[in-house]
A protein has these predicted regions:
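C-terminal, beta-strand-rich globular interaction domains
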Residues: 277, 286-378
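Long, hydrophobic alpha/beta structural blocks
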Residues: 11-17, 21-324
């Protein structure tokens, strides 16, 4: 799914735009026991409660494509005949009304999910969307629809203890200590089937993970029986390792600055283009950046081999997963320097009297802990 398709579905999660009739789910304690079930009619819930449920489900479609939102791809064999795909289709086709099917799904989550000692809430909703046609100007015509997209959305939310505080009790007309448990933002979730080319794609699901470095592979294994792509954090680490191992001493400050600048430029240009498809960088594109910076061909070939070993032949990478485009950071054992990426060129490396130094020009005023200071010898 691309950004436009995700955004189109996210707009469904408003009281006046969705066709969700019931909310289902269960509350699970830290011992993996179901404490209670949820089976609520959206029509009789107070509006503020209904909106809170919708907001939680909506968050399972939030974040960045390729970072928080990950495509899950089923094989042809799985779609043709597999328990995991059959269960997901049954959830959708039953409109979540079959309690036994829901229970089977809950147990798949409960038996696999590791949230430590946290209690959590599993939420499920079924929706049908009359997909509006688009006119020749790529604008939606709300009065014209030739397809219906039926889907299930799920999210898993930690339930946290609230600290005891004083609260007013109108019946007693007094203040007393009160505590309780609150539902936090979803830790993970998914949409099935995917909404590709504005239509159902039963070969794909869209998985959500709040943390980009912890995508809960254990749940993906249990529910989908597939291997998810590398997390954004894993991609970044693998790319850095491929680069540093291949380049060795040639991996200097100037080269890393140039790579960061080139990738950052690509990210910014992609944002400005409003292209809904994720930005992609091939291994050959990355190798070309090294070549433009005068890296020896032997080291470039070693880098390519490392990338293929890490990511697979023909792999494409998302530059947004490889660098932090919002900052440029230099670390030593005892210090960290963080700069606006546009000014990364200010940092230089020098060897003076046999010692390595990082140099930053200080042409303007200098502050230390808020105090204006002067440089000796000025």
């Amino acid at each position: 799914m691309n950004l436009k398709e995700v955004s189109e579905l996210r707009r469904r999660f408003r009281m006046d735009r969705n066709a969700i009739s019931r909310i289902y789910g269960c509350f699970v304690n830290s011992s993996r026991e179901i404490v209670s079930y949820i089976d609520e009619s959206m029509g009789i819930l107070p509006q503020d409660e209904a909106e809170k449920y919708l907001n939680l489900l909506k968050k399972a479609l939030s974040g960045k494509i390729g970072k928080n939102l990950i495509d899950i791809i089923f094989s042809t064999e799985q779609v043709a005949d597999s328990d995991e795909h059959r269960l997901l289709v049954a959830l959708r086709d039953s409109e979540l009304k079959d309690g036994e099917i829901r229970e089977e799904f809950y147990q798949k989550i409960i038996n696999s999910l590791d949230l430590g000692d946290s209690n959590y809430l599993i939420l499920l909703a079924y929706d049908t969307y009359d997909v509006p046609c688009k006119n020749k100007n790529d604008e939606m015509d709300a009065d014209a629809s030739d397809a219906v997209f039926s889907y299930v959305v799920c999210c898993v939310c930690p339930v946290k203890e609230r600290k005891a505080e004083l609260g007013f009790f109108p019946g007693d007309n007094e203040f007393h200590s009160c505590a309780g448990q609150i539902v936090a933002a979803p830790e993970l979730g998914f949409l099935f089937p995917a909404f590709d080319d504005r239509a159902a794609n039963i070969y794909n699901a869209l998985f959500y993970s709040r943390k980009t470095d912890e995508i809960h592979q254990e749940v993906i294994d249990s529910v989908f029986h597939t291997t998810a792509p590398m997390s954004a954090a894993e991609q970044k680490e693998a790319f850095q390792n491929a680069l540093s191992e291949a380049l060795g001493d040639a991996c200097n400050m100037e080269l890393v600055q140039s790579i960061h600048d080139r990738l950052r430029d690509q990210i910014e240009q992609h944002k400005e283009s409003h292209d809904p498809e994720p930005l992609e960088l091939s291994v050959s594109d990355a190798a070309a950046i090294l070549r433009d910076n005068g890296v020896e061909e032997e080291k470039i070939l070693a880098f390519r081999d490392n990338c293929f070993a890490q990511f697979g032949d023909g792999a494409t990478l998302n530059p947004a997963n490889l660098i932090d485009s919002s900052r440029f950071e230099v670390k030593t054992a005892d210090a960290t320097i963080s700069l606006d990426p546009e000014h990364s060129y200010l940092v230089e490396t020098r060897i003076i009297d046999g010692r390595k130094y990082l140099l930053i020009p200080a042409d303007e005023d200098i502050e230390v802990n808020g105090f204006g200071v002067r440089v000796k010898g000025e």
